[in-house]
């Protein structure tokens, strides 16, 4: 049984609220879960304390048991200082090459 800590959507249409839950990875996103660990309201300002509420003791216990957090939850846990999130590989594909950069500069001078 692969256990994950993830967000389950709640709320109404166009007014989402998410519950931070521990669930089997095979369960539906908004379906059955093992335990609710907190909630997240993305509509509140980022500096508002009520935007994210987590029971950090329960989160630490589930991580110790082997539960894998989703990407978004891992970001929350990194901000809370519970666990360290790995740096992602972001290649610089959008950076123009030297030839294109030189051509763009030449076109700008005309």
Curated annotation (Swiss-Prot):
<protein>
    <recommendedName>
        <fullName>Small ribosomal subunit protein bS16</fullName>
    </recommendedName>
</protein>
<dbReference type="GO" id="GO:0003735">
    <property type="term" value="F:structural constituent of ribosome"/>
</dbReference>
<feature type="region of interest" description="Disordered">
    <location>
        <begin position="87"/>
        <end position="110"/>
    </location>
</feature>
<dbReference type="InterPro" id="IPR023803">
    <property type="entry name" value="Ribosomal_bS16_dom_sf"/>
</dbReference>
<dbReference type="GO" id="GO:0005737">
    <property type="term" value="C:cytoplasm"/>
</dbReference>
<dbReference type="GO" id="GO:0006412">
    <property type="term" value="P:translation"/>
</dbReference>
<keyword id="KW-0689">Ribosomal protein</keyword>
<comment type="similarity">
    <text>Belongs to the bacterial ribosomal protein bS16 family.</text>
</comment>
<dbReference type="GO" id="GO:0015935">
    <property type="term" value="C:small ribosomal subunit"/>
</dbReference>
<dbReference type="Pfam" id="PF00886">
    <property type="entry name" value="Ribosomal_S16"/>
</dbReference>
<dbReference type="InterPro" id="IPR000307">
    <property type="entry name" value="Ribosomal_bS16"/>
</dbReference>
<keyword id="KW-0687">Ribonucleoprotein</keyword>
């Amino acid at each position: 049984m692969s256990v994950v800590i993830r967000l389950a959507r709640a709320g109404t249409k166009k007014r989402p609220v998410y519950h931070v839950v521990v669930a089997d990875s095979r369960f539906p996103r908004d379906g059955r879960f093992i335990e609710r660990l907190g909630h997240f309201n993305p509509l509140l300002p980022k500096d508002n304390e009520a935007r994210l509420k987590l029971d950090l003791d329960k989160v630490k216990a589930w991580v110790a048991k082997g539960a894998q957090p989703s990407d978004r939850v891992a970001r929350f846990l990194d901000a809370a200082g519970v666990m360290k999130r790995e740096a992602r590989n972001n290649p610089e594909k959008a950076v123009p090459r030297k030839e294109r950069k030189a051509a763009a500069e030449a076109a700008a001078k005309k």
